[in-house]
Amino acid sequence: MSENIDDIKNEDSKKIKIIKLRKKVVKIVTHNDLNGKNNSNSSINLDKHNNKVEYSQNRDNRAGGYSQNRDNRTGGYSQNRDNRTGGYSQNRDNRTGGYSQNRDNRTGGYSQNRDNRTGGYSQNRDNRTGGYSQNRDNRTGGYSQNRDNRTGGYSQNRDNRTGGYSQNRDNRTGGYSQNRDNRTGGYSQNRDSFPSQYQVSTKKTYVGKNTSQNKYTTTPMSFRRVIKAKVPSIVSSASSVDSENIKELNRKLGEKKKQQQESQKSYKRKKAETESKTIEQKVFEQLQKKKRENLANPIPKSIDIMGSITVSDLARKMNLKSSDLIAKLMALGVMVTINEKIDSDTATILVEEYGSKVNVVSIYDETFIEEEVEDQSKRIEKPPVITIMGHVDHGKTKLLSVLQNIDINQTESGGITQHIGAYTIVYNGREITFLDTPGHEAFTMMRSRGAQVTDIVVLVVSAIDGVMPQTIEAINHAKEANVPIIVAINKIDLPDSNPDKVKHQLSEYDLVPEDWGGDTIFVLISALKNIGISELLDMILLQSDMMLLKANPSKRAIGKVLDAKIDLGRGIVCSVIIEDGTLYIGDSFVGGVCYGKVKALISDKGVSVKSVGPAKAISVLGFSSMPQAGDPFQVTKTEKEAKLISSKRQDLKKYESSKNVKKVTMLNLYDSIKEGALKELKIILKADVQGSVEALKNSLEKLTNDEVRVRVVHSSAGVITETDISFASASDAIVIGFHVRPTSKAQILADQEKVEIRKYNVIYDAISDVKSVLEGMLEPDVEQQFIGFAEVRAVINVPKVGVIAGCYVSRGIIKRDAITNVMRDGLQIHSGKISSLKRFKDDVKEVAEQYECGIMIDNYANIKEGDIIEAFEVKKIKKTFKT
């Protein structure tokens, strides 16, 4: 009884302290906005029944601290039920409690036992284990109290919700603040997505006393005491305020949504306007650009064309697009493609549509360079240009060696001349330029060019061999060029020499010696023994004096390309003979269809010079591309003029090529089919100089007959490159290099692509090897040679095998796989091949005369007794190549 009295006293002292705290008036801060659904404050909790307000979270308008109150119960650390005053102990049914709680007038200690329940610090209900926290309905407890099998920590969880310091409801995340309905919390409690600060207030109010007892409670992280206060009058009208706030909120949301829609429409409208302006700007810029282009490249007032022109070329001349011309032609009813040609009449109509005119001209007139008006008073004597011609091995090059005191043959493979050479010597104070031409039949064009650029031809004829085919050819070249001939009969030092025989042979070609009453100069020489050389030079100077050779060194240079090659260190190097005028470094020129500007001039001695005059041979560096040997060389006023002339000549070349295109007609259809049946040996030809390329190409293309032919798919001067190997691999061709070798990379690529490269230094070897390859491509001749015959004495029909003829070899031999003719009554009734030959049951290769055997003929069963089987052996005879 005394213990109960002490407990009551302690409880009373606690109540007195709480009453003192209540006397301190505090300001309560309330939130301006209310939750439309829960009707609860976010910063304060209102206890409707007991008029208590706390910072903790309230359910059903209950005041709370760390403990949660249910059903209008005041809470501290302990939880109160049914208006019960609580401390550390909990009271039930309006019972006063201390550390121990009494139920149903039962005495309690530290542990309270209910209905034979074990107690400790925690109070157990209905056979439940307790700790500091009170468990209900077989629930595990900690500091927090769990309901309905919920795990608890400091926070109290409802309906299987995870808790922290804050209490979560309806799967809401909590921190120090308590969240409701997916609301974010801070130190204050948020309701219905309303923003929270530490305190949000719309109205200040004083809090009065309350009869209910409370303990100290603190709001998390704020460390403020919870004070009971009277509920202000504003709470009574919460429902109406909530309704108005909801309407106001909906109205604001509607206005905001409407503003967003209008803003989005405005953005789309502005974007469309911007895009439209951008498109218009682009179109305008394109029109301006086209206008500027037209101003920069206006349509010419007149254009020059030949008989026909392609649409692309016409568009280029008119500074228009090909598509524009094609569209215009379509409007005129003419359907063409970009590379299709139109005649001059159609071109005239089309050009007139654009306000221009057409001048139909001959392109030949445009390819000529207008020469200077020559002042005859400036013409002076020039050195003679002498071309040495004759048959191979008649001593032409040896003669030049004597004239220059050098051994030229050491520089030529095989001891024969395969390049045209130019040398200048001085004799009796006068210069003489010599051109050495090859004597081999393959170098006909070189000899022809030599005759065209020369002043005098020295025809070298062997006193032993006499007149040979190339001798006659040289005579014809000289006569065509209208060039005088001096005959040098060489090798007179040999015992078998017969100069008179040579004179007699040459007289048949209108070359009659002066001592025979003719006008042709004959000189007997021996280049080996240096006999008659001075006399020959004297005759050359005499002949040139009689011809009155003159030139004007002050005019622009005119000459001819003798040869061209590619030097690895210098590029394209061309040997040019200057016929008139003087060539300087820096001059612009045209050589054939090529143009260029002189970068360097190198003499025959290998010395760089600044200029070269008439009748001199010089090596020129500066060609834009490789010219052809024999092309005319001419200096122009400007580089622009040189480019224009070069372009015109290229057009002429294309025009002539287009005219030479062979069209298939009914008349030549058979020839085309026959030509397609020919076997071709495709060759890619590379040589050191352009003249050698030309000579070797002409010689190889002559190797043609009814079955095979050579086709040079590509030829040029220079080393064998990777491009040549790739071309050969694609076209299934072999590569022939004449005096050139492949680069290291080209050789590696050739090994990878299995491309055959053949290298030659002598033209004879190249032609001979190609002939051998062509012979291998020829189909061999097939001949049937009689080897024997056999008489059929029995016919045996073997099931699943066939008909076997039992034979007796009456003459010669019978071989397996031999060709047979089956003869009956003197007539051939079948021709076939022996598929099986046996002696008794053994397979044999052949059966000799007077032996019996079994013969089965392939795919033939109509054999009878008395038939004669003739056997033949097929032999293939290799053909020899004949042109």
Curated annotation (Swiss-Prot):
SUPFAM superfamilies: Initiation factor IF2/eIF5b, domain 3 (SSF52156), P-loop containing nucleoside triphosphate hydrolases (SSF52540), Translation proteins (SSF50447). Residues 526-528 are annotated as: G5. CDD domains: IF2_eIF5B, IF2_mtIF2_II, mtIF2_IVc. Residues 381-554 form the tr-type G domain. Its main location: cytoplasm. GTP binds at residues 390-397, 436-440, 490-493. It comes from the Bacteria. Residues 490-493 are annotated as: G4. GO terms for molecular function: GTP binding; GTPase activity; translation initiation factor activity. It is found in: Cytoplasm. The keyword Ubl conjugation does not apply. Residues 390-397 are annotated as: G1. Keywords: Cytoplasm, GTP-binding, Initiation factor, Nucleotide-binding, Protein biosynthesis. Residues 415-419 are annotated as: G2. Residues 436-439 are annotated as: G3. Belongs to the TRAFAC class translation factor GTPase superfamily. Classic translation factor GTPase family. IF-2 subfamily. This is Translation initiation factor IF-2. The gene is infB.
